[in-house]
């Protein structure tokens, strides 16, 4: 008879087989009520799963990530059940869990509308309230395929037909609706209380643009009303901060159909861009980087030698000229090796740090493009460090210090670090990988930095560390990376003369801090909601005259501040001062400098912050000192 070991090490012995729910009820009625599923010997199972032998068991409730996934997967089925009741001719396809929710794809004679979603959600609530038991049965593959074809679900049958013939498949039924799924699911639909349908989109069957277009319905589901409300609030905040809307509001950039995934930078946006570039150029110079510039279009032979032509060709823009094939570079690394290869290098030249604000182009699918966050043309703060194996740890350590300084200057201090180690398919010996992985982990440990291990997630050419930022809405953005590369230098004939006179292949460290400038600026726009710190703001201050009497003085001060390198403008329009203040406050200019007769007489300005705070009357020199301090300290 089964002996069940619980997570706290305690054991429970039973005289007969018992279900996961039965064990939960034996522990206590509160746990039984909260039980959604279980984990038996490491495998997730339904609450109805019968235990017949000695096992380890943990109960899944809504308080865990596993529980939340069960809720979301089950809610996707609830959505499909509601759609089938409301639109019987619709066919169901797939409905996976995604971050913060789920989606389900449907084949129907028309796309669903936002009005349809309201009706579908109400039907889902009705079905949840009915509290249908969710039951599981198993069928052989061919029998499952025949079953779904028999009820008119051709898409499900196609999915099943692609599964090996000897497989048994599980089906889950609730009320009159049955769907294919590996499970586990909640015990009954009454467990599904806190959900919301979010939007409708199009999706090709099996992700292939040659197939028919389906309707994808997105939803979210949570363990409590409080969690659902908080998520909806975050979405509303994200919508309010959407960089595409703010880009238009603050006249920063636009993207148009004639150049999909390519950015048209407006003066305000380009001001931010160049401020970031100048900042990165200076911090890299101070940290031993030498800036280079490499060609935009390169013969395919280099990409063949580097391995990119075989692995990345579909994502490359190519062109033919004079019977030669060229590619617009999708990354900078092969070109950086060409710079390294010019002239024989010695061990005394290492580490050699080559940096480029490299413009790259990748032929991303049009459906994946999203404002500045996913583009086809972008610039990276790209650099490659050529060094010996013994230098890896020190270089990673120095780079990490630089990365954290840069992130802090931009206002990000919550950084998630992940170390990805060797995959099954890789180049290089285990001994070399051991050294490289240890160098990366030791560099992080020496700084006392917390990090997560991702076994097997490294690139085929070497392990890597990825640095992700968490923004004010709790969203995570992977920006920085440092990757060890044992492959490319050798493929492209890079060598240096070692201390013993032998020729050796250097290790190459690929590294970036911001990643794509475009994406990083998109993150900044949303993080600051357009209220950029003074050092980044397109316009750092605006001078406002009260009457025409101050116009000459205002222009004089404007020119003086511009000559000091500040980004300032003047507003001499014949409008009431209150109107002008409101207009520039809406534009989130850091400082408004109001000038009346008294300010002219005293060679001063009345300073207002963008939040409406009165900073008092200052001499022009005093304001200059204030702005210089704000810029140099990277104050937020």
Curated annotation (Swiss-Prot):
SMART domains xref list: tRNA_SAD (SM00863)
Instruction: Provide the cofactor note recorded for this chain's UniProt entry.
Output: Binds 1 zinc ion per subunit.
- Catalytic activity, EC: 6.1.1.3
Q: Give the UniProt subcellular location, in the record's own words.
A: Cytoplasm
Region (Catalytic) spans which residues? 242-533
Show the InterPro entries listed in the entry: aa-tRNA-synt_IIb, aa-tRNA-synth_II, aa-tRNA-synth_II/BPL/LPL, Anticodon-bd, Anticodon-bd_dom_sf, Beta-grasp_dom_sf, TGS, TGS-like
The reaction(s) catalysed by this protein are: tRNA(Thr) + L-threonine + ATP = L-threonyl-tRNA(Thr) + AMP + diphosphate + H(+)
Q: List the keywords (alphabetical).
A: Aminoacyl-tRNA synthetase, ATP-binding, Cytoplasm, Ligase, Metal-binding, Nucleotide-binding, Protein biosynthesis, RNA-binding, tRNA-binding, Zinc
Q: Which processes are annotated in GO (biological process)?
A: threonyl-tRNA aminoacylation
Name where it mostly resides.
cytoplasm
GO cellular component, alphabetical, reads: cytosol
Q: Show the Pfam families listed in the entry.
A: HGTP_anticodon, TGS, tRNA-synt_2b, tRNA_SAD
Chain residues that bind Zn(2+): 333, 384, 510
Residue stretches making up the TGS domain: 1-61
> Listed GO molecular functions?
ATP binding; metal ion binding; threonine-tRNA ligase activity; tRNA binding
Highest taxon of the source? Bacteria
Which cofactor(s) are needed, names only? Answer: Zn(2+)
Q: Which family does it belong to?
A: Belongs to the class-II aminoacyl-tRNA synthetase family.
Function of the molecule: Catalyzes the attachment of threonine to tRNA(Thr) in a two-step reaction: L-threonine is first activated by ATP to form Thr-AMP and then transferred to the acceptor end of tRNA(Thr). Also edits incorrectly charged L-seryl-tRNA(Thr).
Query: Quaternary arrangement and interactors, per the entry?
Result: Homodimer.
Know the name of this protein? Threonine--tRNA ligase
